[in-house]
Amino acid sequence: MRILILLLAVTQLAVSSPVITRCFHGGQLIAERKSQTSISEFCIKDDVSMLKSEIVYTKNDTGIFGHSKVFRHWTITDWKACNPVVTAGGSINVIEVDKNLNLVTRNYVCTGDCTITVDRKNAQIIFQTDKLNHFEVTGTTISTGWFKSKASVTLDRTCEHIKVSCGKKTLQFHACFKQHMSCVRFLHRSILPGSMAISICQNIELIIITILALCIFIIMIILTKTYICYVLIPVFMPIAFAYGWAYNRSCKKCTCCGLAYHPFTNCGSYCVCGSKFETSDRMRMHRESGLCQGFKSLRVARRLCKSKGSSLIISILLSVLILSFVTPIEGTLTNYPTDQKYTLDEIADVLQAKTHEDSTKYYIILYTSLFGAGLTIIFAGVALGLTIILEVLTKINVIFCNECNMYHSKKSIKYVGDFTNKCGFCTCGLLEDPEGVVVHKAKKSCTYSYQINWVRGIMIFVAFLFVIQNTIIMVAAEEDCWKNEELKEDCVGPLIAPKDCTDKDHKTYLSEASLLATAKKITQVDAENVEILGKTMESAIRVIERQKTYHRMHLLEAVFLNKHCDYYKMFEHNSGYSQVKWRMMIKTQHFDICALQANSPFCAQCIADNSCAQGSWEFDTHMNSTYSSKVDNFKHDFSLFLRIFEAAFPGTAYVHLLTNIKEKKPYQAVSMIEKIKKKFPNNKLLIGYLDFGKYLLGLSHASTYELQQRQLDKLYQPTELTRSGGQQTSLANSVVGQATKECKKYKDVSCLSPRFGIPLEDLISCCDQPNYNIYKKPKKVYKAHDKEETWCINDQHCLVDFVPAEADTVEKLKPMKCWLVDPGKNDDVYSIAIKTCRVVDKGVCTVNSQKWNIIKCDSGPLYYSDHIPGEDTGNDIGHYCVSAGCKTDRYPINPDVVTDCVWEFTSRKSQYIGKISMQSLEDYEKALTDRLTHTLETYSFAPLENLPHIKPVYKYITAQGVENSDGIEGAFITASIPAAGGTSIGYNVRSKDGFPLLDLIVFVKSAVIKSTYNHIYDTGPTISINTKHDEHCTGQCPSNIEHEANWLTFSQERTSRWGCEEFGCLAVNTGCVFGSCQDVIRPETKVYRKAVDEVVILTVCITYPGHTFCTEINAIEPKITEEIELQFKTVDTKTLPYIVAVNNHKLYSGQINDLGTFGQMCGNVQKTNSSILGTGTPKFDYTCHGASRKDIIVRRCYNNNFDSCKLLKEETQLIFNDDHDTITVYNTNHLIGELAIKLILGDIQYKLFTETLDLQIDAKCVGCPDCFESYSCNFQIVSNIDTICSLEGPCDTFHNRISIKAMQQNYAVKLSCQKDPRPSGTFKICNREYTVVFHTVAKDDKIEINVGDQTSFIKEKDDRCKTWLCRVRDEGISVIFEPIKAFFGSYFSIFFYIIVVVVVGFLIIYIFMPMFMKLKEVLKANEKLYLQEIKQK
């Protein structure tokens, strides 16, 4: 009883305990399958869910089966709310399961509407949506996440090259701050607030130079406490000497001590010579008595070495000197004859090609040398000979009448005494003038019409001779062969070959067959098939030998010999390309009889040395006895003879020989051999070989010789011209069909030519007899799903027209034997209807000029759909109904009829920042005042958009041209500029006499080296492994393990043992576990390969006040226009990497596998479309279970070195436009070279200009102080004369000279203002002042946005100011006092002026007053001397 209670308690405990499951509990079943091959268990996570597999094994009479199930658990529960679709390059990675339970990774995007904006003031990217959506930011800043209303990402790098994705939108842009942000990021991570960090970093150079000066000063103070400080004596000695020299000559002496005047201090104890005195009187006496040795410079130098003031000065100078040669931290950029063997079949073609090549080269040289002389001789001979011949021929038609001095036609002429009935009428058309006013003079031109007729007739006759020449030659010897129904010995190839061979190189198989068709020997259908002979003699001979009927073989052989008309003509000699094969066989393969009867004359001369000089042979009785006793030797020699004969005479001759042997009448072939011998009597080796063949054919063994199967295949197999299926029907009344999309009673038409059996197919018939409509046969036809006895092309919707047959084709088939065959049924995707599918794309397409709603399923087909967006079947994510409510079956539409599709779900393509140029300043002001900081466009004032952000440094340049009394005619300037993006130079153009003419700015807007790359594959880390495995209880592993394409196989034997066997398996140390595997990767990195070579493009802009233009130039050719001439003086291009990788919108280069290569480096697992490629040796393990199948654990399948991708070099100097399928890579930071510029200025009549005049000016300026845009001004200037004037403004103007023309009124000027010019400012134009209204827009943009191919403000600033000292100069000392002044206001000015007064007073009292007093004493001394001189006089 106690045992029973215990068992019940254990059972209850087991029932109440929850079942422990792997990975997660529950989940949605998305796929299952029963199969003898099982998958491995897995637990894997993607961006929106987790997946796991479960396998349960069952056994029945047919074997052990695994029931595999795959479950999904959603981690983003409402992920479907974003309406996801599969999109290449999508930001959401989802793992799906196909019908074979293989894991497949796909990229999705949400299709919900998402708005992407850029807040330039706060340097943020803002995303807004109405429902669940997903965003991703990649590039220099990386961020991703889900949101339902609003999200933002802050930018904090100096220059951001990023790709922003949200929903279906993808935006790519380049954003740069006004200052470098590395310092701000470093300080902002500390306790400092953001505003303070920005203020510190704006003046970082000044702060650092101050800190460096203090550090050096502290070190100097420490050194002054030691003797080391005296190493500076050489530095201070020149200063001390100069001070001593000035001390003795420039300073007034104190009346008490004799030293330099010191009004505010007591007299000292030390003299300048170093002596010490107790009282000032003794020192004065020492000075006045001349005992003082003078100023001691070394003593002063030693004091300076110990002085703190000198240490401070040296520290400041050293810090300035050091940092003047150092690039600012903010501006630094961190960079991290063939040897070939031929077969005997190919050697004829190779030899002929070599011979033809050598002959061609010889004749080219020969004809080129004789061309000039030959033309002269030919033309002279033709001119002379043609004239004589035409005169003779003309006399046949025309006579010259001496009575009337005219030419008369002989036709219908009658003589009347010495006159004719045509006297008075000449062949030239002139009548005799009865009055004698016009006197006809006989000329040769009177007979020109007859001469022209004769020339026309001669040309037609010559052309006719050329046409019939080959026809006569070709058909003369073959007159009877075309009529034969079987092969005769007179019609074999060597005997019907042309005797003459001309114009061989211009002959083609088709042209020769056309001549036969013209001669009515064959039909045109036969002639059109001769191109099956191919392009080489080897292929042609093989095609001829494969023919199974005499007519076909004879036809092809005749065409072949007519084209290669010298093929058998070479047999008249002892060499030639057509004899190489059989001669090589004789040389390399020997008859057995010659080994047994080596002394035989035939063997000694023909076989041993290939001379065969004797010419006739008698085969002795020794050969007879040998062959009679040794049948095997006869079979060998006879077989070798046949092979050599086939190599020498392929085609009909060889078939004729084999036919006689097969019919046991080999002796009947002797007459054919005799005729061949007579045709080629000079070919000694051939004669000897044929004589030996005659001898073999005459032996008794030849009648019993059995042909081999290969030889039997060469024989003809005549068959009746018929077809295996279909009904024979006469198509004599058939007609060409009319264009139609539906074919009633469709039948396939198959015809044979009546004589040679050449098939005429690829035709169909529609309608009933006898007037069949004939059409060209389409590739595939389908029976319409909604109409009886109606057939359609390509699909079941009848959307494509049947193409009518050609009229001449219909005429050809009328005399032929034809059969009508019922069409076969096409069981493919176009005959299968569906209700649901996984939709890839949905949109509107044009189908036969009509707009249809089309969807594209993941299996590939297109369907017409009235699908309601968002209607999901619920099976799994991505499955949608094809028809509304899944009520109607739909058949696929062939994509050939679908055009102009506008897909709603497209692959992700990047958008770029738009550029809008405003022609009107009012429109530009509106764009700025509307605070369009969140828009994805940039606005610019068109006349000034080609200027740099920062005013360039101006240089003086002299205008060249022709000087005249008014100025310069055809003025121009020449200069050179570095070909680097962002480079700008201003030019003050002056005349040769120094008169300022105008200002212009040359700006290299962009200088790029670019190339296009194509996407070749994706790679990434392995996140799972697809496996399929099976096991055998006993036996060995299969030699060939079945596996899918691109899967690797694995196996292990002796896996069955006690406690480790499947159901019903009792085995030890035997059995096998085997299977296949494939990696599943997360496609994180895209790999691209260069498609085109690099292109260098330079955009140069020229801007005058009132006129601007840009032009592009490449590195290959100069650019010349009416306004400018550009040419590269030097070019230094840079090669872009051949293969690059893109990960998180960053570009990498290095050791990357190309498509199809799998080295141990980045990219050795490659995903292309839906295929995964890779190599490796799988490593697997298994876990044993008693009476159950083993669990297979695949630890590695492919060799995946994705970690090496993380070690690739990031190409920070390169930017790119990413469109997924292609990328365009730009190098915008390379100095391409030096560019020479010539600007055409036109005529400048500056000597007639006036500098001072009154103008009617209406002006307005719009902009913001200390911002990216600065101020843009538009001047409406009305003037009656042309002049050039100076231009000054309240801020720094980009142009200081303006050319005013009477025919132009609009002028644009850009100003750079650090402060607000207030409501109005004063411009000075032509020495007259004008008040201009300023419209200041309150803007505090922190970032500047563009597409990245043009230079930014920060880059121009770095290029302009490349040292610390330059930055300190630009920042100025005033930045230290700016915060104080802003706090105290006007009181700070009062304090500042007091400090200035104190400093100036100090300088006057201690420096200038002693010097003035000394000057006063010198003047008084001179006055005393003057008075003394007067008294003495």
Swiss-Prot record:
Specific enzymatic cleavages in vivo yield mature proteins including nonstructural protein NSm, Glycoprotein C, and Glycoprotein N. InterPro entries: Bunya_G1, Bunya_G2, Bunya_nonstruc_pro_NSm, M_poly_OrthobunV. Residues 1-16 form the signal peptide. The record marks 477-478 as: Cleavage. GO terms for biological process: fusion of virus membrane with host endosome membrane; symbiont entry into host cell; symbiont-mediated perturbation of host process; virion attachment to host cell. Residues 17-203, 330-369, 478-1387 are lumenal. Glycoprotein N and Glycoprotein C interact with each other and are present at the surface of the virion. They are able to attach the virion to a cell receptor and to promote fusion of membranes after endocytosis of the virion. This is Envelopment polyprotein. The gene is GP.
